Amino acid sequence: MNDSTAPTAPAELSEFIENRTYVEIQVGDQSVLTRTLRPEDIQLFAIMSGDVNPAHVDPEYARSSLFHEVIAHGMWGGALISTVLGTEFPGPGTIYISQTLKFSRPVKVGDTITITVTCMQKFDHNKHIVFDCVCTNQDGLKVIRGEAEVLAPTEKIKRARMAMPEITISDRDARYRRLFGRAQGLKAVKAAFVHPCDLSSLQAATSVRDSGLMEPVLIGPEARLRGLIEQHRLKLGTTRIINVSHSHAAAARAVELARNDDVAALVQGSLTTEELLRAVIMPHGLRVAGRLSHVLYIDVPSHPRPLIITDMMVNIEPTLAHKVDIVQNAIDFAHLMGVPEPKVAVLAGIETVTPRMRATLDAAALCKMADRGQIVGGVIDGPLGFDNAVSLISARAAGLKSVVAGQADVLLAPDLESGNMLAKQLEHLSDAISGGVVLGGQVPIVLANRGDSVDSRIASCVLALIVANQYRSRRRA
């Protein structure tokens, strides 16, 4: 699940906000409001109030609490009572005098709460009104009961309802936790960290080790590595270091370890991508029948599901034959990530096929190859522009009738440049989180950008772990 945007107002609200004056209200009059509690309501209330009691915001803690799950802040219900009094009954011009509340049972995520405010007493000498306030859940059980006293408005007020700004809750940690959770229950693997002569690489290595995801093997100049570890006060523990003099030798040794099944994954350190991949694709490297390609698993907060972008790091100008392998690798990876029949959008600048744009010809050919069973396991459509690949609104406006258009799981970029720019735009301008891995070799390979955070590197290691476990199962079968 991705980060969400809170609606500005329920659909049933009118465009005007209007009060009921003291003389218009009679004893026994009521107003009713209904709300369903969402996880983001709890998050937003916690952010606004500063009340980060773990009973409300920490699912792990909540499971061991009295109610065994996250519950709403008590004052969320109180705020809904205030909403009725301040916006509907009496409405604008109302001034709170006092409020009592008694909490009978918890409100949980998914509960639908009905707030009923009833006029109980009126005092003509000061225009005060006492209201009975009751909140019941979807089972008709009272969760909150109280009494409010207000100074009611004496003048009629009717104004256009103000349009409130959208609020997006961006919880990067939660999105990373969801991704890391995919490794739960998987067996840790040995991974060669190739020339990890920088802080981020070493932090990632120690983090995946401490998390039980991987058993890192550090390959590089031992004296330099130990110096960095000591300088940054990292705990080496029993982590093995293989001493080699330079980055070329580190890449070669890592490939040798993988070829001999001594490690199940490679993780790029501070050497260049070209340097590492050159060792991988050597005649006695790690290539198998298909072509190597990179997949980026990216979670954009404004999008309803994660996307897989390929290829942004390995194939510079892929041919049609190359794209067949790239698409198949991405489909197989999507299966591992829980997408049973991934929808693949072959991206181009336009939706029509024209010989003047090679990307459109490749898209048409790939679709036909999928029809003929030359690419299996997914549904492919293209050419599609990026907007029509990810937005149903755009796809419908363009008149595109396709199960892929607007609902793509996989985005195949025309070339490395476009894929790289697309991915980095989402990462840097849309607050996306991501992890990537190279597929198609004997073992998965994690490539790193200089600007990658430690969390991003760990995310990539999680993906490599998922793939490595699949490769291991396949070999045993």
What are the language-model segments listed below?
Residues G28, F45, G74, I81, ...:
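Buried hydrophobic positions in well-ordered alpha/beta secondary-structure cores of metabolic enzymes
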Residues S98, H128-V130, L292:
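Short coil/loop residues immediately preceding or within conserved phosphate-binding loops
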Residues S104, V134, L347-G349:
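Short loop/turn motifs enriched for small/polar and acidic residues
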Residues T83, F103-R105, C119-Q121, N137, ...:
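A residue-level detector for short acidic-glycine micro-motifs
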Residues N2-T94, S98:
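Hot-dog-fold acyl-thioester-processing enzymes
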Residues T87-D111, I115:
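Mid-chain, well-packed structural core segment of small domains
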Residues N2-E12, I17-Q30, K108-I169:
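HotDog/MaoC-like acyl-thioester-processing domains
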Residues I169-V217, P221-V404, D409-A477:
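Anion-binding alpha/beta catalytic cores of soluble intermediary-metabolism enzymes, centered on
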